[in-house]
A protein has these predicted regions:
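Condensing-enzyme catalytic core mediating Claisen C-C bond formation in acyl metabolism
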Residues: 1-37, 41, 45, 139-168
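Active-site-proximal alpha-helical scaffold in enzymes
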Residues: 100-116
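Conserved phosphate-binding/catalytic loops in two-lobed NTP-binding clefts
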Residues: 84-98, 115
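Phosphate/pyrophosphate-binding loops at sites that engage ATP/ADP/AMP, CoA/4′-phosphopantetheine
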Residues: 45-62, 110-115
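Glycine-rich phosphate-binding loops at beta-strand->alpha-helix junctions
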Residues: 61-80, 95-97
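Acidic-glycine-rich active-site phosphate/pyrophosphate-binding loop
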Residues: 12-21, 73-85
């Protein structure tokens, strides 16, 4: 299945050349129809397996936070699990597919809007390039208190210095 979603040329295996760039070999190649079929099968199955291994029941799960590849895939997973779509975190309509960041972004949003609370039984489920997939069950905890806030001005200053040093 790795040929269905991959980057044909990359890294030291096939470094960039004029020919590989001209042929678009450093961009993601995807057979959308087959990836959709795969994703709709594994999202539900992986969630069920994780819930079973945690010795939970499906009705105990407060929210499922899936990879946000495509809303239709999430809807198909909901149908496969026989759950209302409201049990799923969905933000792909706001941000599109944010790749590996989609689950953490959705989790933060669910906390911010009160849908994900302390002690909620939660499933995180995703799939990706090479048609890998996985799911994990978590009992949500409160965030650790921060000692101090991040000093954005300092990091922007460091970024300007780094940018300057890369140009000289």
């Amino acid at each position: 299945g790795g040929d269905l979603l991959s980057v044909p040329a990359s890294g030291s295996a096939m470094p960039a050349t004029a020919k590989t760039i001209e042929q678009g070999m450093h961009f993601i190649k995807m057979n959308g129809r087959e990836v959709f079929r795969f994703a709709t099968r594994v999202m539900a199955r992986a969630s069920e397996e994780a819930i079973e291994k945690a010795e939970w029941r499906l009705d105990q799960v407060e929210i499922i936070i899936p990879h946000q590849a495509n809303k239709r895939i999430i809807e198909a997973a909901a149908r496969g699990l026989k759950l209302p779509i409201e049990k799923f975190a969905i933000n792909v309509d706001k941000y599109g597919n944010t790749s590996t960041a989609s689950i953490p972004i959705a989790a933060v949003e669910m906390v911010e809007n009160g849908r994900l609370k302390k002690n909620d039984k939660t499933v995180l489920v995703g799939f990706g390039a090479g048609l890998t997939w996985g799911a994990v069950t978590v009992i949500w905890k409160e965030p650790f208190p921060a000692d101090k806030s991040v000093n954005i001005d300092f990091y922007q200053f460091l970024a300007r210095i780094r940018s300057f040093l890369l140009r000289v």
